[in-house]
Amino acid sequence: MKTLISNSKKVLIPLIMGSIFAGNVMAAGPYAVELGEAGTFTILSKSGITDVYPSTVTGNVGTSPITGAALLLNCDEVTGAMYTVDSAGPLPCSINSPYLLELAVSDMGIAYNDAAGRVPADHTELGTGEIGGLTLEPGVYKWSSDVNISTDVTFNGTMDDVWIMQISGNLNQANAKRVTLTGGALAKNIFWQVAGYTALGTYASFEGIVLSKTLISVNTGTTVNGRLLAQTAVTLQKNTINAPTEQYEEAPL
């Protein structure tokens, strides 16, 4: 009998361990920021969207409470819907939907406050604000200064891992520099909460959800995989802006 119990344990232990590893792997880092209706937009702005033609935007675009006349993208630049609070938006494609936009803008503010309020931070003042050249693990990062991406930066984690970047100053990405994802990390799980402005340099590559208190400026030729959610304006210059995907895609070399 004793031998049978012992043998049973020998059988049960690997079965239990196998079931643990076969199950869902727990995500590292904080839980994701809930975007609500703001998460249905690739670009959302309270005071307007300017553009140097041509840009390409995949996903929905919206402006509120400012008039639709401040949404300066052309219909052929957007694969998705363009929502405005009145009939002054781009013709013939803009959709007058003030209630949806009011809700989305409210949710954008709630998401910003949520991201800004996450405690405790796992990393504070990392690199004294210079994160270029670093590989970042999942977690909450906090700076009381500007954050600069002067060389390429890497986010390494699984598809379920989450990063929240709490930035009290501005976010600056240098020209032709890249935000790179490895290990399965997804742009939809990287949240940049920026109290100042966000400036992405020319021909750069950026990943993540930007929740900016003020301006988001995307300079010539830059590609963004994520969302641009600004409490003031968004400026584009011949850019490619794609809503984040649900699956990991290896970045081209």
UniProtKB/Swiss-Prot annotation:
Annotated phenotype, changing T214Y: Has 20% thermal hysteresis (TH) activity of that of the wild-type. Has 2.6% thermal hysteresis (TH) activity of that of the wild-type
Keyword rRNA-binding annotated: no
Outcome recorded upon mutating T235Y: Has 17% thermal hysteresis (TH) activity of that of the wild-type
Location of the protein in the cell: Secreted
Keywords: Antifreeze protein, Disulfide bond, Secreted, Signal
Chain location of the short sequence motif Ice-binding site motif (T-A/G-X-T/N) 2 per the record: 232-235
Disulfide bonds: C75-C93
Record-annotated site: Ice-binding: T67, T220
Residues of the signal peptide: 1-27
A single cellular component GO annotation: extracellular region
InterPro entries documented for this protein: Ice-bd_prot (IPR021884)
Motif (Ice-binding site motif (T-A/G-X-T/N) 1): 220-223
Role played: Binds to the surface of ice crystals and inhibits their growth. Has ice recrystallization inhibition (RI) activity (the ability to prevent the formation of larger grains of ice at the expense of smaller grains), which may protect membranes from freezing injury. Has high thermal hysteresis (TH) activity, which is the ability to lower the freezing point of an aqueous solution below its melting point, and thus the freezing of the cell fluid can be prevented protecting the organism from ice damage. The TH activity of this protein is 3.8 degrees Celsius at 14 mM.
Family of this protein: Belongs to the ice-binding protein family.
Protein name: Ice-binding protein
